[in-house]
């Protein structure tokens, strides 16, 4: 069992200050140090890498694809049609929204996907007055940095105090200002989708 004094001392030693503003990498570093100092194992979910073994079905499918030469060619620029279709079906099943498979763009991860999205938004909305991305919080902290690097304005909305109708009203209020070009919600449970 971890004791509060050890955790508090490490937070102070790492100069994290207000721990509620720590980044994902800060959390990862802290958990590694605490593991080493206490001998207590942690389940690492902070980087989206829980260390779970892939399913046998996935391993067999990957082996089959490699044996058939999939690594010898690049996939189509817009993505593999059956994967785009599956992504569309997933969104429909999970949150009940119809998304055209054409709008499902596969990436190697959420960092790459959001960076490409922010680049596209920056170019598509330049000079229109819609120059700000609304980032729903809690989200993926690196996205604010990505916007800064690109020069795309961003504003956050911490949904802790907004649920149901209150959230809808707040979103409508923010969008009504006329400067929002996109709303980004990276679910902390799995930012990659």
Label each residue range with its predicted role.
Residues 2-7, 14-112:
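N-terminal small-domain helix-loop-helix segment of the aminotransferase-like
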Residues 67-193:
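Conserved core of the PLP fold type I
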Residues 10-14, 187-190:
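Short glycine/proline- and acidic residue-enriched helix-loop micro-motifs
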């Amino acid at each position: 069992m971890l004791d509060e004094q050890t955790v508090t001392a490490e937070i102070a030693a790492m100069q994290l200050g207000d721990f509620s503003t720590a980044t994902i990498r800060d959390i990862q570093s802290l958990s590694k140090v605490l593991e080493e100092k206490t001998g207590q194992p942690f389940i690492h979910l902070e980087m989206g890498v829980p260390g779970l073994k892939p399913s046998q079905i996935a391993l067999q499918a990957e082996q089959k694809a490699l044996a058939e030469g999939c690594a010898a060619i690049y996939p189509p620029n817009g993505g593999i049609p059956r994967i785009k279709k599956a992504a569309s079906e997933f969104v429909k099943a999970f949150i009940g929204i119809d998304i055209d498979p054409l709008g499902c763009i596969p990436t190697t991860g959420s960092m790459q996907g959001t960076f490409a999205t922010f680049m596209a938004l920056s170019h598509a909305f330049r000079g229109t007055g819609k120059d700000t991305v609304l980032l729903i919080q809690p989200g993926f902290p690196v996205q604010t940095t990505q916007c800064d690097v690109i020069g795309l304005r961003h504003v956050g909305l911490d949904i802790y105090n907004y649920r149901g109708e209150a959230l809808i009203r707040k979103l409508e209020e923010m969008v009504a200002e006329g400067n929002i070009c996109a709303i980004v919600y990276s679910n902390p449970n799995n930012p990659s989708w």
